[in-house]
């Protein structure tokens, strides 16, 4: 399975404390209509940390059902417990996901050997395509390029990585060490074009929740050799990307989607609504982009 182009790390719409299935299905449908290249439910942006196990399964199940094979679904299945990650991966496989996204274990800060053994054990237990997810700013641990290459060499089920270290040297080394068949996706909306320029294949994006056509257009333009168009889209996306991270993700992106009329704004504690000045700033950016 090829995971490339722009994949949306899709939000989980909530209403009265429950998953808003109607809004979620409508959002998925709009994403596909706008030309997105894949969907990633139950990631950080989908508030996976505060979903119950039952809700986690429902979010993935609904996404797969609504997509109906039109674009790849890469289901979030990570945990800081290897055993729990195996269970989440098994569910994703049984539900019909095209692959699973596995974040590096967080909080318990495993060594590089521990990271290697974690991914190896999951793949041995549940055989399916995996994309690893390196985001040291959230997990407290960085997976080095050497460890990524070791996993790629020994664990064929691991077909790529979502790289959100914001370290272009490390990303370049991963591409160098792992070769062109290893799918390296940006996990940072600000570094999509630089990552593509050194051999990456796309992005798992937050900002594409609100502008799927623009982010998929950037990736398509680059792949087609239209570097001028890709650069133009990169700069058009930059103000929106900054706005998506003016507070903790996914607070701004869910607020933006609410302003656009695509969902009711509801977050789960400890996430709280935006500060008034930041909300005003966000609305201004969306207005300039013609989104509200």
Curated annotation (Swiss-Prot):
Reaction catalysed by this chain? L-aspartate 4-semialdehyde + pyruvate = (2S,4S)-4-hydroxy-2,3,4,5-tetrahydrodipicolinate + H2O + H(+)
Q: Where in the cell is it found?
A: Cytoplasm
Report disulfide bridges, numbered on this chain. Answer: none
Matching CDD domains, A to Z?
A: DHDPS
* GO cellular component entries: cytosol
GO biological process, alphabetically ordered: diaminopimelate biosynthetic process; lysine biosynthetic process via diaminopimelate
Cite the position(s) of the site with description Part of a proton relay during catalysis: 44, 107
Q: Which InterPro entries does the UniProt record give?
A: Aldolase_TIM, DapA, DapA-like, Schiff_base-form_aldolases_AS, Schiff_base-form_aldolases_CS
Q: In which pathway does it act?
A: Amino-acid biosynthesis; L-lysine biosynthesis via DAP pathway; (S)-tetrahydrodipicolinate from L-aspartate: step 3/4
List the molecular function annotations (GO) for this entry. 4-hydroxy-tetrahydrodipicolinate synthase activity
Domain of life from the UniProt record: Bacteria
Q: What class of enzyme is it?
A: lyase
**Record-annotated active site:** 133 (proton donor/acceptor), 162 (schiff-base intermediate with substrate)
- Residues annotated for pyruvate binding in this entry: 45, 204
Q: Taking the first listed entry, what is the main subcellular location of this protein, grouped into a coarse class? A: cytoplasm
What does the UniProt keyword field contain?
Amino-acid biosynthesis, Cytoplasm, Diaminopimelate biosynthesis, Lyase, Lysine biosynthesis, Schiff base
EC annotation from Swiss-Prot or TrEMBL? 4.3.3.7
The reply to whether Amino-acid biosynthesis figures as a keyword in the UniProt entry is yes
Q: Name one Pfam family in it.
A: DHDPS
User: Record's NCBIfam families?
Assistant: dapA (TIGR00674)
Family affiliation: Belongs to the DapA family.
- Quaternary context: Homotetramer; dimer of dimers.
Q: What does this protein do?
A: Catalyzes the condensation of (S)-aspartate-beta-semialdehyde [(S)-ASA] and pyruvate to 4-hydroxy-tetrahydrodipicolinate (HTPA).
Q: What is this protein called?
A: 4-hydroxy-tetrahydrodipicolinate synthase
- Source organism of this protein record: Oleidesulfovibrio alaskensis (strain ATCC BAA-1058 / DSM 17464 / G20) (Desulfovibrio alaskensis)
């Amino acid at each position: 399975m090829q995971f490339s182009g722009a994949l949306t790390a899709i939000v989980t719409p909530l209403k009265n404390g429950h998953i808003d299935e109607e809004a979620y299905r409508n959002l998925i449908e709009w994403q596909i209509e706008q030309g997105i290249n894949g969907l990633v439910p139950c990631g950080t942006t989908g508030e996976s940390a505060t979903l119950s196990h039952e809700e986690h399964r429902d979010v993935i199940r609904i996404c797969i059902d609504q997509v109906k094979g039109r674009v790849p679904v890469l289901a979030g299945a990570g945990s800081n417990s290897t055993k729990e990650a195996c269970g989440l991966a098994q569910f994703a496989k049984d539900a019909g996901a095209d692959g699973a996204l596995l974040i590096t274990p967080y909080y318990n800060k495993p060594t590089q050997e521990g990271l290697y053994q974690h991914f190896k054990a999951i793949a041995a237990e549940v055989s399916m395509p995996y994309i690893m997810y390196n985001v040291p700013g959230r997990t407290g641990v960085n997976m080095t390029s050497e460890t990524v290459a070791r996993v790629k060499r020994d664990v064929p089920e691991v077909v790529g990585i979502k790289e959100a270290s914001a370290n272009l040297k490390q990303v370049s080394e991963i591409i160098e060490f792992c070769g062109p068949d290893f799918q390296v996706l940006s996990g940072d909306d600000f570094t999509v074009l630089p990552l593509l320029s050194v051999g990456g294949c796309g992005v798992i994006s937050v900002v594409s929740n609100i502008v799927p056509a623009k982010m998929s257009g950037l990736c398509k333009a680059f792949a087609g050799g239209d570097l001028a168009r890709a650069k133009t889209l990169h700069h058009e996306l930059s103000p929106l990307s900054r706005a998506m991270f003016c507070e903790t993700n996914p607070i701004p992106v869910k607020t933006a989607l609410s302003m656009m009329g695509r969902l009711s704004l509801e977050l789960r504690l400890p996430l709280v609504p935006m500060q008034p000045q930041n909300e005003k700033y966000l609305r201004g950016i969306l207005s300039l982009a013609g989104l509200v």
